Amino acid sequence: MTLKRREFVGAASETELSAGINSSATSFTVTSGSGFPDGSSYPFVVVLDRGANDEEKVLVSSRSGNTFTVAANIGGVTSGRGFDSTSAASHDSASKVGHVLDATTMTDISQTVYDNEVLYWMGVA
């Protein structure tokens, strides 16, 4: 995967879906998008139903007000649904939505740090 950069903020309070969504929805609306990234710099990740059997991470390309748009065709990611080794699922109205640091991002960071250390050790960097 070539997608590396994500947008993060520290002030995104957990919110809820305004209406239910099915597993192929390409956008969703929450009760309050305040504090979430807007995607203008980089895509960001949210988690739906954290801790539930149907927990799903979603790569989001943009947010306008309370409406989030699911990423598609960004850096080799064909769909942002079921991101970070989760599965796309249906979620009911009032399902919890939170901003999250995902394992894919942490793996990308780890690989980049490792690669740079190897280059430094080799005297290339």
Explain the meaning of each model-derived region:
Residues 25, 101-104, 113:
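N-terminal regions of proteins, emphasizing targeting and processing segments when present
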Residues 1, 110-125:
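Viral virion structural and adsorption modules
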Residues 84-106:
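Flexible linker/loop signature enriched in Pro/Ser/Thr and Pro/Gly
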Residues 1-81, 111:
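Autoprocessing Asn-cyclization modules and mimics
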Residues 24, 51, 94, 123-124:
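Glycine-centered flexibility motif
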Residues 66, 76, 96, 104-106, ...:
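Intrinsic-disorder/low-complexity loop/linker signature
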